[in-house]
Amino acid sequence: MAHVTEYTCSGCGLELVNDGRAFVWNEETDMTEDFLILMSTCQKFYGAEIIGNVSETYCSECERYVKVYSITEVLGSIDDACDVVMRGIENHIREHGRKLSKLKDIRKRSQYSISEEDGHYVVRIPEFESFYYSNYLFPEMSKEEVIEDALNDFHEEIGGLIESYEKRHQRYLDSHYLVVDNTGRPKDEFDISEKVRCPECGSEINKHVDGQLPCPRCGGRIFGLGIFYD
């Protein structure tokens, strides 16, 4: 279960997230993938050659978000781990953009198949394998009504997914990236007031976001709302 805290500044409205994300890099994909630590995502650690965590902060000089990738483990003979992770971040952002474009194309085409199974209609979207629609509970629906209802459901489902992808992709594009090597640091060591340098302008900024710390943009007070994800 992941605990995500969404912070909002009471003064300037800046929004920041502390979600305890992890990241992995492996040679096969050459991508640095960040994710919430859940039961469903733990398998991502297997086969990873570089492991670490991600924190989000903000540079008031650049007026940009800064994502800090802290390397905690290097499993294998990789000398330039920081450069490798940075290259993997760039590859991951490009791949995320391609997936977003593909989802938009799938929505645009809206190709479907309809079949009769056990006396009711079933509609599937071949390019969107998770979608399944059946009129099992409403057998009186005509074939045309089933298709119309299924496509409405499909557009609602894929539309929500696209919106989520767009929001995340824009955050990727709006951020600077910093990779630091923490492999020599004890895993349980954590300093909420730790500072880092903005990779763009060199300004000293907080590495973490927390309700105990002032807003990194205006110095005002930030308030957090905690959410749990299974």
Task: For the regions a language model picked out, list residue spans one by one.
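A short, exposed loop/beta-hairpin motif centered on an aromatic-Gly-Thr core
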Residues: 130-149, 206
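Short cysteine-rich clusters marking metal-coordination/redox-active sites
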Residues: 9-12, 59-62, 101, 115-116, ...
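Short linear proline/tyrosine/threonine-rich motifs used for host-factor recruitment
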Residues: 114, 121-125
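Cysteine-rich micro-motifs
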Residues: 32, 52-64, 211-221
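His-enriched metal-coordination microenvironments in redox/metal-binding proteins
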Residues: 1-6, 228-230
